[in-house]
């Protein structure tokens, strides 16, 4: 207990009570003034910061690679699919493979390209280009070369 409280308890006089009441009323008035807002205030809100769309040049360079491959067996199809998953375009030359294995690779890569939202196009005899969704193929060159018709496989 502080000395002022003890003093007030034992030696309380009417003048001191009146002074205490006056200071209490003054504190209450000051608090009301602080709580009452002025009638009109100009309130300005900070502008919302918009997020800028900035693409690093490094990122653009990384996503625009073309990989040239010449697989010899069907087991290399998964490696080709990994390039596509890495957002790289792939040109595949299947001329050194048997026709049966080449058809299997094209079927596998067609499914892979479909799954990633890309595209596959024939660009030459037994040559295909597979692209992920970030690469667009424009134009067609199939009419420019004389393709040998393979009578055994009608799909190609």
Curated annotation (Swiss-Prot):
Residues 23-48 are annotated as: Disordered. It comes from the Bacteria. Residues 23-36 have a biased composition (Basic and acidic residues). Its main location: cytoplasm. Keywords: Cell cycle, Cell division, Cytoplasm, Septation. The keyword Transcription does not apply. Disulfide bonds: none annotated. It is found in: Cytoplasm. It holds the Pfam family SepF. GO terms for biological process: division septum assembly; FtsZ-dependent cytokinesis. InterPro entries: Cell_div_SepF, Cell_div_SepF/SepF-rel, SepF-like_sf. GO terms for cellular component: cytoplasm. Residues 37-48 have a biased composition (Polar residues). Homodimer. Interacts with FtsZ. Cell division protein that is part of the divisome complex and is recruited early to the Z-ring. Probably stimulates Z-ring formation, perhaps through the cross-linking of FtsZ protofilaments. Its function overlaps with FtsA. Belongs to the SepF family. This is Cell division protein SepF. It comes from Bacillus cereus (strain AH187). The gene is sepF.
């Amino acid at each position: 207990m502080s000395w002022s409280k003890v003093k007030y308890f034992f030696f309380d006089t009417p003048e001191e009570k009146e002074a205490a009441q006056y200071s209490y009323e003054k504190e209450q008035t000051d608090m009301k003034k602080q709580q009452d807002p002025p009638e009109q205030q100009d309130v300005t809100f900070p502008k919302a910061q918009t997020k800028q769309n900035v693409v690093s040049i490094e990122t653009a360079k990384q996503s625009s690679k073309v990989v040239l491959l010449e697989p010899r067996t069907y087991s290399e199809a998964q490696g080709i699919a990994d390039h596509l998953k890495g957002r790289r375009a792939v040109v595949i030359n299947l001329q050194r493979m048997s026709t049966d294995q080449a058809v299997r690779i094209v079927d596998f890569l067609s499914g892979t390209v479909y799954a990633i939202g890309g595209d596959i196009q024939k660009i030459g005899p037994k040559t295909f280009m597979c692209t992920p969704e970030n690469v667009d193929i424009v134009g067609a060159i199939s009419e420019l070369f004389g393709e040998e018709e393979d009578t055994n496989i009608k799909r190609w």
